[in-house]
């Protein structure tokens, strides 16, 4: 077996650690959050363009081979960009910004595809997921300690994402990537320990429930082979959970005043009160968006109306509102496609697909963020491991005199 050359080791190291770290920073919205908080002077668009350029260039020197399944995943983002930038069926003062945001996401999507088309794509995607989790939970802890302010909702911590509803989604998706790519149960449990405070500090109701289901299923299905380790983890985790609960409880107090919003959220999570787990405001927003979508059910009102005028907090209703029945069928069809493939391959990427689908009834706009693209492309690469390499080769000119001599000789 040939030993890798110094150049091979260098380009693979840059791919895994530099490009993977950049994708993790993009997934965690580290550039946007740090810039808006006044920590970093680098504008997010400059970081995005630099990351895309570096990832594509480094991928090209690592001999990429494309997973054709990612083209199916790219269909919905491409349709939404075409609808927003070219058709412009929904016209508003924010439409240019919406089109620019979708274009930015398509560039990030291409960069992720390029990186995950290389031979070391599994290590790179794994490091991207780990770094995104560390950045997200770390920024939330810094915010809790009063070192910096990111959140847009007082009383709930958000980290770089700025809105506390996004960190639980990101952390569960990144855990899904880790479960799909890493077979090391102890390392995966360590990453669960990283995710728990990141979700808890947001006081997110759906986030805590989905994290508990995801991690609970993973631990139970692997408990038999790791019983001794789990027993040790339980002994350590119980007092830590007690401390965590006390910290969360103290977070509902602001001096002598009690934050009713966070207190009610915490009570609903502790008691599994499904009536309190529901949000009356979200139910009203969903009904308003549903009524608007019903006015143009076939083709929708155009990309951009969801998130600017209406906030259905439901990805299916959001896409129905924007793209009509074709968009809804395309979105639901993508999930059916991934689920079918996962079942046929013995449950490959099952945790990741669950993490992706679980939040679709509880939020909107996830298809416009880097961590969703990273998770979707990773799922496609895991489920369809076959790769195709496109090369440009020139056919060598045939020596006519040589051919003529052969023909004469045969005659």
Question: Language-model segments: which ranges?
Answer:
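Long extracytoplasmic/lumenal interhelical loops at the membrane interface
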Residues: 150, 157-158, 270-323
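N-terminal signal-anchor transmembrane segment
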Residues: 1-62, 75-88, 139, 356, ...
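Hydrophobic transmembrane alpha-helices and their immediate junctions
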Residues: 185, 322-360, 386-388
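A membrane-periplasm/extracellular boundary helix in multi-pass inner-membrane enzymes
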Residues: 138, 222-271, 291-295, 410
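Membrane-interfacial helix-loop-helix modules of multi-pass inner-membrane proteins that assemble, modify
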Residues: 32-37, 81-94, 127, 131-167, ...
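Alpha-helical transmembrane segments of multi-pass inner-membrane proteins
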Residues: 122-149, 161-222, 341
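Transmembrane alpha-helices of multi-pass inner-membrane enzymes
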Residues: 24, 53, 351-360, 365-411
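Aromatic-anchored transmembrane helix interface
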Residues: 41-51, 70-82, 90-114, 124, ...
């Amino acid at each position: 077996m040939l030993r890798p050359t110094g150049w091979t080791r260098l380009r693979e190291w840059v791919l895994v650690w530099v490009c993977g770290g950049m994708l993790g920073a993009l997934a965690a919205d580290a550039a946007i959050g740090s810039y808006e908080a006044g920590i970093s002077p680098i504008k997010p668009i400059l970081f995005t363009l630099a990351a895309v350029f570096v990832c594509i260039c480094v991928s090209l020197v690592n001999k990429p081979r494309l997973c054709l399944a990612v083209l199916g995943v790219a269909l919905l983002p491409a349709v939404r960009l075409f609808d927003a930038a070219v058709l412009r069926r929904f016209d508003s003062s924010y439409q240019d910004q919406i089109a620019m945001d979708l274009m930015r996401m398509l560039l990030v999507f291409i960069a992720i595809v390029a990186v995950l088309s290389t031979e070391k794509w599994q290590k790179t995607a794994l490091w991207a997921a780990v770094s995104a989790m560390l950045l997200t939970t770390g920024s939330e802890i810094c915010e809790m300690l009063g070192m910096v302010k990111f959140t847009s909702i007082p009383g709930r911590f958000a980290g770089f994402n700025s809105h506390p509803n996004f960190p639980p989604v990101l952390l569960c998706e990144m855990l899904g990537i880790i479960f799909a790519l890493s077979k090391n149960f102890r390392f995966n449990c360590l990453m669960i320990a990283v995710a728990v405070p990141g979700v808890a500090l947001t006081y997110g109701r759906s986030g805590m429930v989905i994290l508990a289901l995801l991690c609970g299923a993973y631990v139970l299905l692997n408990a038999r082979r790791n019983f001794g380790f789990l027993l040790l983890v339980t002994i350590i985790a119980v007092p830590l959970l007690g401390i965590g609960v006390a910290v969360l409880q103290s977070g509902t107090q602001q001096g002598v005043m009690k934050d009713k919003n966070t207190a009610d959220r915490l009570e609903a999570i502790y008691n599994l009160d499904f009536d309190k787990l529901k949000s009356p405001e979200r139910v009203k927003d969903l009904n308003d968006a549903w009524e608007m979508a019903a006015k143009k059910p076939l083709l929708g009102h155009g990309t951009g109306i969801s998130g600017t005028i209406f906030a259905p907090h439901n990805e299916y209703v959001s896409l129905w509102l924007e793209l009509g029945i074709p968009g809804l069928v395309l979105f639901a069809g993508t999930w059916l496609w991934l689920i079918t493939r996962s079942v046929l391959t013995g449950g490959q990427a099952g945790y990741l697909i669950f993490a992706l689908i679980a939040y679709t009834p509880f939020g909107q706009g996830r298809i416009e963020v880097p961590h969703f693209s990273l998770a979707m492309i990773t799922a496609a690469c895991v489920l369809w491991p076959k790769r195709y390499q496109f090369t440009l080769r020139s056919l060598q000119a045939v020596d006519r005199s040589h051919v003529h001599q052969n023909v004469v000789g045969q005659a």
